[in-house]
């Protein structure tokens, strides 16, 4: 049954301003026609006549087509999202306005070049550092085990000890070897001790899971076997191996991983080949069990020990080589068990690490006992000096005498030097405190050191028994044909070598981890791990050959008796390669490379945590390279299948430049046609791995922003839209999986969006109209062409209204218009709106599967924005990286840069810089950030949905302090709730965003007046709950709580500190007494306090400006006073050191932030403003704590529109406190309203006017006529009018109108939801006339009604509640003001009194004493020529409290400076990880298709989807003319070309531009394809022939074989590509099968989209077709 539509005639661009009856629900056909943008001037909706439609909707009208008897639906092209409507343009209106210049999003060429150089240098440093440290660690460890094997052997050493002999030998005893045993044990135990410390720290300060008994016992058994295997290899086998063989054997430690790799292999096409290679690796690894003893006969005794130790060692890494996808069920079970073990490893290894150290000690004593006695191992001071006898054999008498003469000369020379130094030392020392002489001289004999006689000889006096005498030994012994030279070994050389070896291990681990974090794993980790053993073998074999040739080789680094074992390693390189042992080792090396092949294909995210990189929390000092390679996780990230990357099926009514039939079919294996998104949201209605895709909801809150501020925020959203569309197109059409892919949706919540017109109806205010006007400008600025977005859809909602825009990238932008009379306004309630809408309604209500809810919530993020923020997509990537890195991260914020003009903005630039450089960085490093600013922050949905977060955030402020804590600092309170629930908040310095800062003094003070009390209240709330916070939040320790307490105390005492500083500076600068200086400074401060407590806010701000200017001038005296103080006290005085430390820390921080170095320039303004900002501002904030108005961007309503609100009693929206300080405290309550609706007052005013006019008219014509009109008050009643039969018709009509309005007024008083709730006048506003009307889904409308009723209904307060609130706020103000002033006054008095009386009570500063040298005659000896020198030393005297607080502030500064250094290193890592290296890429000609597309997919998609130039020929594309000379601008030609182009439809969506270029690309066509400018072609990837061929081939593989036929009749700009012609034929059949859907009748057309006419034809007939 057909419904008759509105028959009012409308113009061509006229909108339907009428509204349907609220009680009448339109039927489907009517609503569908409206939803499609169709309008009928008369008649009814026709039935579906396919034949007639097909005839009448061709490219041109057929003359034989009969005149339709019923209206024909003409599609509303005005609402097509892909092209702009051709409006009627006058011939004279052709002058152009160029789009604004593009924003400078990057940092310039030199910045990018420096990042490239930095990344290259990092590649090189990491490679060398990891490889070098791994080689050093392994070599030095083998050196220690080789030294154990030298025990009891006589070795040949360098003949430099006894140079007269041809050969020097030494016999190493157990006393010489025992130190290397302990050194080896320490080298094994040090990493385990470090693991114990880390595990205990995590156990004590973080909330980690406790293992079950079975899990603990299982890990204990495995690690025990592993430790026994290490002990056998190190203490039993290695001492008997030469160095080269020992290094080679470390490649045979992956027998168990080789077996597990086979049984964990996932079945696939190449599984058979992979299994064959796996068995080959097993065979290669098992060869170490039998081959090594066979080729080395001396190892026959270790025939059993070698396979046992290697197998036990390889057990440790079993967790990394079992997979859940294995075909064997036991392996899958074991993999799940391993996953649970990883979650509980901290508490497990807190005990296991100590247990392993005990195992190492037992193995040491067990296996070394066969080489030496236990008594030798337990000797005292095993690392000390030991006597070593070096023998020179085969010497004749002449050589012996020459040796004796040389030694005696050396001894005499040593004695002379010892006596000289002893005499000099004795002269220096006081006579009563002579230390004991040490007669152990060091004698230099060539290049070694020798001690003779006694090591210690006690002096014949005191302390003789404290240092016992050691045995004496002769310097040398002479025999018949040889001599012995006795010398002491170097003390603690083994201990130093252990420290050096552990340092190399430590560096290797952290450089490897850093390489993995910054996405340099192949070059910085995998390659060094593969090369470490070959390089070590090469190094050791070279050293052995060199030692064979020269016995003195290496003695300049090592002691003469220390070197590697080189049994049979002195062969040449050719002989070494040809030995069977070398070939077996190469098999081990190849098998290890295959088993650790996962190192070359990392899949982890940037800056991944150690737990995500390594399976075990420890590494082995003996072979750190193998332990790290096997410990590196294989499965880092869940794989997202390409078919799960779903995209919306495109509707033909919403797509213009598409391939026929393609809109309902997606490319093969890229999109899934079986699923869609819920209500145009980002959540799919079926489970898939795509649930883990990052979803970003940008939620901005707006109020009274200017047009420039709105444009900045909108440009940021359009940048995100463009970036997301490029990534979507790259995946959709280029079949590339982008690891950084995300889905995006934008919401803007507009507070106070409505005004009330003269009829009491809501109408959109000037700010809403402003954003509607600037949205096209923002899009034009981003896309660098004149853009005109598709008109929005407008809908009436329970909270006001909603505008829905489709951005050029097909992402949606929702503008929610809030009516203060229907819903609470202000920023916190807007945040509650989108929390409940996006997380409560869309996620929790629409998704049924709980597991899906958890996955989606962990990967859904809300990007909170202010209405004036400006950012880039790269800044969002960095925050998302932090979120992916840490699952417990609840929020992340970036670096905020204030923008604007004026001195206040310059001050804030420096203030923001110091706050971020030092304070935020410190919070990030030692705990977590306390406040994530709402202007640019990323919140995790999972954290916001947790208990006591979103629900508590929606609480209504009941107590007076709630208004301060909850509503004045909503961002900080939300972060406080996250911290109390155990989530972490982080800061990323590389994520930049700009926001407009207050430019005026008053606005700045009002902003800080909100921030300071809310900050103090939230910190105090956190400190009160510190026990719970420390318990549940692993990022917050008791030390961080103490740090926050210290910062709170410093903030409270800040005004007093500045006050004392000014007093001292004035006193020193003007040489006046301290008390006089106190009076001078106190007068303006006291006056300001009195003004703040008594005067109006406007007068307070005037007083603050005046006094602040006076103190700024006095700060010049502070400069002079500080300089005089520094000169008087010296550079080592505490004040000087503090001043230098502050200046140095600021300058260093600026140098470490080179891109922000200019922020330090306004430091002078910051210095002059210190008294104003750190003394006056806190006083102003505390004294106005009861004032809870917003204070910034307040736009007072016009007087005529505010009259009603002022007359309304009890209405808290405007208040009446403009001149009453008592009521100033309630101005913020603009959400509330009284019992009388403002509309009632409007009606009363209009009724009064009507009655007055009627009375005047009546008195004029009928003076004797008695009238009476009773207009009751707004509390109730009706108007009663006595009608007279003598009244004429006009009078009767006026009376009836007045009566009708009276009755409506009475109804309004009974129901506050009267006409304002039903009115749709704002929908007919001129700014929205082109917008299409839509209606909310019933379910969504029900949601909004419920959430408003429960949480967001406007606040209604009666007089008593207002009085109670006012009294409570004033009481809080009074109490906190008293506390604040008393604490500072006590502090000031204490410091000043102690300063005055510091002669009596002081602390002497130990540094920088001053000396006064006086020479006076000495009369005691009656000799006038004798003079006496008097030295008087004076030290600086400090008052105790001043010194304590100086140390207090210095400690804070040191902590912040060190934390800033650590944070800068982390930021550097983040920048390096995010920087893409271009210089080593293959050239385009050398890249294969897959490599080309994979490396440049997003950039190619971004170039293909560019809107600029898409509708023009290559030679007609407008290039900017402002840089050209006047003679070359071609003004007339450009204007003519522009006029012609204005008559054409313009593509307005990125998808359509991409498809048009993508399907038109052909390597057979001209090198300048349609839509590309000939300018800068060399810089475009898509214009290169290699790129075009690769894209063409990729397109064919996705969409079918190309048809090479050309259509010469088609112009180059609209030429159909080969794929288009092919796809047209492929989808012809499907096109004929299209049927009407629930959204309305779809038009069937055989015409091609690119051949559509520029204007729709109209037919002549009785029915007039119109579009709206």
UniProtKB/Swiss-Prot annotation:
Subcellular location(s) per record: Cell membrane
Ranges of the Extracellular topological domain: 138-176, 234-242, 293-301, 369-487, 544-576, 1067-1074, 1122-1136, 1180-1375, 1462-1668
Reactions performed catalytically: [(1->4)-N-acetyl-beta-D-glucosaminyl](n) + UDP-N-acetyl-alpha-D-glucosamine = [(1->4)-N-acetyl-beta-D-glucosaminyl](n+1) + UDP + H(+)
SUPFAM superfamilies, A to Z: Nucleotide-diphospho-sugar transferases (SSF53448)
Biological process according to GO: chitin biosynthetic process; positive regulation of nematode larval development
Domain of life: Eukaryota
Region of interest called Disordered, as start-end residue ranges on this chain: 1-51, 1192-1216, 1625-1668
Protein name: Chitin synthase chs-2
Organism placement in taxonomy: Eukaryota, Metazoa, Ecdysozoa, Nematoda, Chromadorea
